[in-house]
């Protein structure tokens, strides 16, 4: 049964709603499903005193909901759709000069605003189901709010939803009035039937459905993630369906007539089994449904920064969505919901879904911002800002597509692209194809571009077996034309035909305001060419390049392996016919394990595109170290992003910066040992590293290999500006270069704390050998240590961090005879044994009985 307006809970707050809108500019209304906010409240708005007869725009997130609500409201008024209440959708509208309430989809409002920033004649904009937070809704709200704040202080805004996160919204609408309505729903019993293996959820769903279709007496609504799942279950269930039950698919890409059939009341005493995506979560009421079966899954388009495009991802729905789905069983009577997952799984899920602005492709939205005159999301009153890095990446993509200038103003191409109801990439492809068709006299190039754009908007028309070894999109065009009568193909061709007419109309005369996106393309234009033999299939790559300039890809050494202009490696099966081509355009990519795989591509005649001026290369001087010549050589490269398309050796003088960069790259590749550090340089580094490890309080700069390699430009770079040969590099005084990193005071401390030599009593300079494994070592003959009673030490004497040297005591023949770090203990202890041996071996030398008080000497006894 259908509830009349008088029976609906929203009626209880009618006076409050009317007063709030008459007295304030902004209202937030929270009303659960079944309250009547979409089917009753809009009719009250027509009589608002504050509107003075002005128009109302009522936004709906889905086309089928917009059309149904317009029809329902018109019926309540006893009028035809298009009189007082009308609707406007993409490609379809029913409005007249008498229409005061237009039910529209969110993207339509954006286009209306772009053509009329003051919303002339409109007094109120109503955003229904705002909790869904689609990208289009966020954008439409931001533009409307911008108009309200800057141009139309009389413009009213009403946000309605079953559940509104009012905290974030109130930040942008601090003056808004908040109202809440009771809902009307019936109890829904919830049970959980999780599959034993989550990967086999479709088979489990099929088993559950088989068990209920013949026993359940009412209509059943099944929530599935995507259209592929709907088709699979529909095919598997066809043989099990009782005659009393109709099987109806319901998803966004379905023709409106078929969507209408799915939600219309069943006739002749029959029930329905509706297999739906999340399109049926809100807005739509399917009469007779008292059983919901929820897969707990959804397919969402997530923007992948690796592929620079959306990827369809299946994921678990949030709790809020699961609650909404279950509620569909209790809209008109008590019901039951079977969740195909466990209760524990439900409890672990997030409360709300992530808003689309944080995960979707931002290019279409930022293109609209550019049209609006904004160069940053922060310039508009957005409910939520996208992540900054993603936003900046998207702006740069639009600049690279030459749709925006570097100052984020619309270019000439950008203005043309804004007239097309498709992604900016595809629109750029269409306008470029039309221009090339005329300039290069290539027949039917625009037709081919329109077919490619329409194909890329849809799922692949090849089955999985065909796709395995054939990613050539040109073959899809041929199949599309040869099998044009297939239902799926027909939808693609209709869209391609629409693109074609819009493009033709754009060249003949300016498209009227609001024509793009929501007025049908002129039918007087010539029809698209669908003859595969006449289409320039070999030019697919030429067309696709305008949509994906960063995906020009050059073959690497291995067949099927390519490098793209934006620096990512991509692969296709080696058996694919395209795998041997030198250059391709990788139109669609997907992540497979650790690599990016090509789903759709086309061969690309790069050098023809360069000759025609379609692709512009940049000249880049490239230096590299030649191992055979042992020197740096230079080459002139013609590059497209990361791709080198042509290189020639050159002897021209190169900039010092490039020389330094090349040397640093080579040294990092080879390691620090590749530099010819002499003994002095090596000892310097050992002293420095020893000082850092034992005298950390001095806060000296680092001198480890990793640090020196990372900072080559600072300590070595200034001395490489005219070095071209390795022999020149080897001649550099690395000790001096390293010491130059210390200031004068640090150098003096370095000499004092970590001296290079120990000067003994006989004035001999003995090298101190530093090590990170032990204390520093010094070697000298025993005779030159007589009289030394304090072991020499290095380190900071002011900080109690001195370290005694390891003394390697030598015989007159300069052979080690003892090692000690305590001379006093040596003189008093093991010296006696050493003295005996030395007297026997070297009788001419002086071996005193009291070495601690003897005079150090270099002489033998007869010269003393």
Give the location of each predicted region.
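Solvent-exposed loop and beta-edge segments used for protein-protein assembly and interaction
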Residues: 23, 214-216, 579, 680, ...
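A short, structural micro-pattern
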Residues: 182, 331-332, 360-361, 446, ...
């Amino acid at each position: 049964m259908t509830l009349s307006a008088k029976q609906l809970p929203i009626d209880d707050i009618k006076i409050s709603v009317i007063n709030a809108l008459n007295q304030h500019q902004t209202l937030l209304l929270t009303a659960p499903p079944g309250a009547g906010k979409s089917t009753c409240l809009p009719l009250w708005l027509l009589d608002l005193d504050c509107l003075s007869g002005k128009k109302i725009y009522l936004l709906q997130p889905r086309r089928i909901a917009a059309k149904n609500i317009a029809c329902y409201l018109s019926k309540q008024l006893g009028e035809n759709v298009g009189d007082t209440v009308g609707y406007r959708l993409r490609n379809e509208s029913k409005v007249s000069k008498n229409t005061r309430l237009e039910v529209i989809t969110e993207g339509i409002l954006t286009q209306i605003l772009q053509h009329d920033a003051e919303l002339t004649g409109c007094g109120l904009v109503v955003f229904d189901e705002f909790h869904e937070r689609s990208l289009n809704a966020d954008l439409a709200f931001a533009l409307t709010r911008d108009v309200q704040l800057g141009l139309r202080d009389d413009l009213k805004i009403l946000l309605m939803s079953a559940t509104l996160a009012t905290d974030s919204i109130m930040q942008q609408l601090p003056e808004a009035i908040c109202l809440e309505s009771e809902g009307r729903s019936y109890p829904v019993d919830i049970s959980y039937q999780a599959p034993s293996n989550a990967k086999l959820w479709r088979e489990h769903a099929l088993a559950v459905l088989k068990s209920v279709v013949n026993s359940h007496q009412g209509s059943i609504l099944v929530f599935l993630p995507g259209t592929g799942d709907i088709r699979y279950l529909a095919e598997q269930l066809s043989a099990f369906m009782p005659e009393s039950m109709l099987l109806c698919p319901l998803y966004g890409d379905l023709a409106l007539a078929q969507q209408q059939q799915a939600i219309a009341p069943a006739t002749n005493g029959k029930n329905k089994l509706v297999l739906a995506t999340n399109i049926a979560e809100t807005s739509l009421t399917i009469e007779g449904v008292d059983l919901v079966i929820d897969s707990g899954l959804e397919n969402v388009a997530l923007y992948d920064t690796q592929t620079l495009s959306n990827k369809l991802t299946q994921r678990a729905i949030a709790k809020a969505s699961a609650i909404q789905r279950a509620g569909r069983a209790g809209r008109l009577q008590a019901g039951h919901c079977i969740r195909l997952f466990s209760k524990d799984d439900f409890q672990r899920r997030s409360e709300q879904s992530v808003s689309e602005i944080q995960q979707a492709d931002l290019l279409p939205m930022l293109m609209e911002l550019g049209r609006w005159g904004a160069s940053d999301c922060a310039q508009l009153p957005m409910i939520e800002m996208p992540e900054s890095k993603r936003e900046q990446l998207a702006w740069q993509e639009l600049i690279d597509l030459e749709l925006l200038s570097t100052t984020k103003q619309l270019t000439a191409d950008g203005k043309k692209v804004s007239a097309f109801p498709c992604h900016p990439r595809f629109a750029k492809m269409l306008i470029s194809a039309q221009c090339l068709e005329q300039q290069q006299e290539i027949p039917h190039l625009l037709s081919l571009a329109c077919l490619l754009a329409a194909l890329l908007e849809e799922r692949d028309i090849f089955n999985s077996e065909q796709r395995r070894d054939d990613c050539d999109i040109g073959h899809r065009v041929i199949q599309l034309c040869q099998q044009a009568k297939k239902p799926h193909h027909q939808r693609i061709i209709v869209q391609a035909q629409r693109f074609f007419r819009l493009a033709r109309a754009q060249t003949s005369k300016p498209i009227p305001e609001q024509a793009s996106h929501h007025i049908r393309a002129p039918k007087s234009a010539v029809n698209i060419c669908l003859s595969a033999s006449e289409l320039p299939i070999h030019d697919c790559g030429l067309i696709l390049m305008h949509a994906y300039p960063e995906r020009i890809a050059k073959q690497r050494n291995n067949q099927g392996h390519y490098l793209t202009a934006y620096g990512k490696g991509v692969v296709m099966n080696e058996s694919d016919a395209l795998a041997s081509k030198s250059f391709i355009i990788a139109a669609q990519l997907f992540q497979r394990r650790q690599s990016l795989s090509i789903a759709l591509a086309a061969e690309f005649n790069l050098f023809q595109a360069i000759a025609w001026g379609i692709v512009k290369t940049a000249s880049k001087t490239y230096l590299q170290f030649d191992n055979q010549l042992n020197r740096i050589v230079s080459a002139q490269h013609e590059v497209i992003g990361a791709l080198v398309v042509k290189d020639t050796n050159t002897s021209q003088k190169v900039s010092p910066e490039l020389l330094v960069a090349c040397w640093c790259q080579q040294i990092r590749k080879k390691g620090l040992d590749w530099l010819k550090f002499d003994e002095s340089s090596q000892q310097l580094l050992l002293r420095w590293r020893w000082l850092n490890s034992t005298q950390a309080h001095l806060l000296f700069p680092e001198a480890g290999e990793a640090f020196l390699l990372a900072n080559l430009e600072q300590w070595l770079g200034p001395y490489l500006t005219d070095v071209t040969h390795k022999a020149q590099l080897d001649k550099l005084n690395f000790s001096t270069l390293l010491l130059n990193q210390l200031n004068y005071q640090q150098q003096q401390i370095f000499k004092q704390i970590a001296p290079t030599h120990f000067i003994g009593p006989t004035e001999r300079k003995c090298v101190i050998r530093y090590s990170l494994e032990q204390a520093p070592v010094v070697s000298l003959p025993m005779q030159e240590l007589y009289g030394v009673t304090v072991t020499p030490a290095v380190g900071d004497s002011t900080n109690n961090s001195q370290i005694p040297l390891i003394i390697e005591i030598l015989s007159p023949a300069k052979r080690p005879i003892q090692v000690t770090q305590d001379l006093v203990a040596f003189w008093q202890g093991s010296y006696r044994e050493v003295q005996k041996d030395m007297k026997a071996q070297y009788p001419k030398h002086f071996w005193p009985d009291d070495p601690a008080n003897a005079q150090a000497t270099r002489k033998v006894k007869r010269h003393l």
